[in-house]
Amino acid sequence: MTFSVKAMPFLPSDEPARDSYIKNPMLWADVPDPDVICVDGYFYMVSTTMHFMPGTPIMRSKDLKNWETIGYVYSRLTDSPKYDLQNGTVYGRGQWATSLKYHNGKFYVLFAPNESGAMGDTYIYSADDPAKEWTLVSRMRHFHDASLFFDDDGRVYVVYGTGNMCELKPDLSGVVEGSDMKIFEREADERGLLEGSRMLKHNGRYYLLMISHVWAPGRHRRQVCYRSDNIRGPYEKQVILQSDYGGFPYVGQGTIVDSKDGDWYAVIFQDRGAVGRVPLLMPCRWIDGWPMLGDEDGHVPTWMRPIAKEEKKVSIVSSDDFNEPKLGLYWQWNHNPIDEAWSLTERKGFLRLKTNRVVSNLYEAPNTLTQRMTGPTCSASAFIDFSHLKDGDCAGMAAFNGHSGVLTISKAGKQWQLSMSEQVVSLTDREKSIKEVEQEVKETVQLTQRSVWLRIDGDFRVNQDFATFYYSYDGKEWFRIGTRYKMRFDYRKLFTGTRYALFCYSTKNRGGYVDIDNFEFGDIPQSSIPLVYEQENTGSNYSFPAMPSVSQLPVIRELPDPLTMRFEQKGKVKKGQEGQRITRFADWERRRNEIAAAIQHYGIGVKPAVAKENVKARMVKDTLVVDVTVNGETLTLKSKIQYPKTGRPPYALMIGTSGISLPRKLFDDRPIATMVFSEAQVNDYSQWRKHKERGEYNFDRLYPELKDNGAYSEWAWGLSRLIDGLQLLGEEETKIDCCHIGVTGCSYAGKMALFCGAFDERIALTIAQEPGGGGAAAWRMSHPLDSVENLEKTDYHWFLESMRENFSGDNVYRMPYDHHELVAMVCPRALLLLGNPDYKWLADEAMLPSAIAAREVWARFGIEDRMDYSIVGGHPHCQLPESQYPITQAFIDKFLLGKETEE
């Protein structure tokens, strides 16, 4: 028999309606080992939180979408000093896989800490109201991943381990002697334990849901079901779910639940990397007496119809102003707290954390307060007044796990400082004692006042798991500090998802404290940094610094730091790289102008500015015509605009340098116009056809004093004049949105696109396809490589002849800039670099480190999503492979159309 289920996956057609639908994951947070029941129209869920206190959280929802924590089964566990971080720890242990049941008007939970000895006892608690106090009913021997089951005849059972079962006494005080039995055996191809037992009864049959792993090729983590007409067996087996989802691994372990309307649902968790193990929601359809999970094809659906009308939007995570006399239920302590060492009342509106015990590191520190981090992205910040810390005290905020990224306020001599460090704990296998904490400080800044805002952003999208770290003196202007930290989930360490953690501990003497306020939890703040500008060159606000002679330039063998100012006002280079390092975006304009000056002076020649009154523009049908008059000479540029067949004007625009090499299909279904910049109208140099010589081009009629220029400065100048024309005419006449202009090209035209994007800040998106040496590849990196386009082997019609004279051979290390800084000039706008390693001449070996170094500029300002690179072979030169379609489409959609995607 097939049961009809209303909650089938369904993608609503009208966008606003999506808010009422449930999108998987049901909760993008660490909520492993879920058990769910439905009582009086509410769903109740329990999960594993291990060493965090209070423990065994009870969550409630009316609609399976909005969940809130309504209480905990216990406030602390006291069987061992390990729970107090004394004589060891219980990291990765404590409360595991809990069974939640409702029977005869009472709620019951059963769980067993995954530990040997007394701490391994199984606990059974009960409550009349799950939001209020729970009472310990009994303790008995250890049952691994057990399911409590009340049968219709009044008998009570525990199913545990891999097919083990025993009967409990009616009052749940212990095991009925002689009742232990094996109800099924594991199959030969199944490895490890079958875990996560969930027993239920439906239509007179017994069903046991478990997770299974198999060795066979092509087989994965899966959810299986055993069923029998008799609780003691024999049981038959069926795979009821074998599905991955959303680019993450296969799904398994959880339960099924029926609503008051008779519909059935499954809540099964999925490993999602550093965020932890997250619950997914899916239909459960009874087919031939089996609870089959997922959609009709057996896959986890993205969308589910609403289960019930939502009462209110609630969450298991939250901001907190600490104005209440009790901590919110979204907070948990790492191990048992020391109650006298924290307060919400000693300073009204603040959480006070006091040092109480001298410890060596964060993992030993008591009273670390935590909340789950959430996906796909999240951000949390807090104000910390550290004016009462003592020498040797450490306080701050962490992305806390076995591998942690940590912001620590500490004292160095008489100066307070903030450091960002990466910390990794090593634990003994049995006792979970701390063997070692490896700590690597990535950056330290001196603090200029005795209070600071700290912020950590988390990105848990596919293949991400990154945390970024910030500090602020006013909560408004944020400064990036440290690395973009790769978070990790490691079952051998904490076995939990990464959490936000607030901490304060002492390494010398007790008695110091911090006051914390305004914990703000939400999504990553929308950057206030512009994506595009109306002005061609914001650096025109600054005069170019004087450039030193080549003999004055120091040897710099590594890639120069793109964020460090390099030239003194008098024109002398400071020794090494001892200039001011940019930390604020407000200073980037000045540094970017310095890079532009160096590239023009030593590399390509001057790109001259043009007064608006010297540019005239008109539309001739669909062709843009621009006249530029300088020194009594006029140069005319023409470019036909190809308008899209979809959408409404004004349209985004993609300009192809010498043509558009990207596949036409990337634009056919998008409301994006295209046009081609024919560079020969400015400078007709070509490697493949007859051309004029340097000083004879159309550009040189306007600027005879710049006859030594390289082609890339002149071509960049020409494309900018087309944008001048679009701005002059306006969107009503051109049908073009000048705030969403992109530029792209491949090979030599990929270089051209990169120079155009770098030198015109009105270009929102630059896609440089296979730009090769002289493009994104740093000259320093290509110099030692064989058979690549390096500084000696490039085409010098593109560059100043003096560049070859000045920087050939090992003199390349005297170059005061490199092409990673050309790449960085595109920041804060969007850039995608596409490489092809099959063509060695392109020097992708040099482009990769150049791209990585340049991306640090975007990262410094917290906008690294605006820059990426993809190097993929197996295709002809300048023919984009399908494997690069997704990232290219994502950049086009986001930065030309303003659409966020899963990419």
Regions found by a protein language model. Give the residues of each.
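C-terminal catalytic histidine-bearing segment of alpha/beta-hydrolase fold enzymes
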Residues: 382, 852-903
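N-terminal pre-domain segments of enzymes
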Residues: 1-22, 291-312, 529-605, 903
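Mobile cap/lid helix-loop segments that gate and shape the active-site cleft of serine hydrolases
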Residues: 768-822, 843, 847-851, 859-864
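Non-catalytic accessory segments flanking enzyme active sites
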Residues: 561, 567-649, 661
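Conserved strand-to-loop "acid loop" that flanks and positions the catalytic carboxylate
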Residues: 827-829, 833-844
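Carbohydrate-active catalytic/glycan-binding domains of CAZyme proteins
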Residues: 1-531
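Gly/Ala-rich beta-loop-alpha elbow adjacent to hydrolase catalytic centers
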Residues: 745-749, 753
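Cap/lid segment of the alpha/beta-hydrolase catalytic domain
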Residues: 656-732, 738-739, 772-775, 779-781
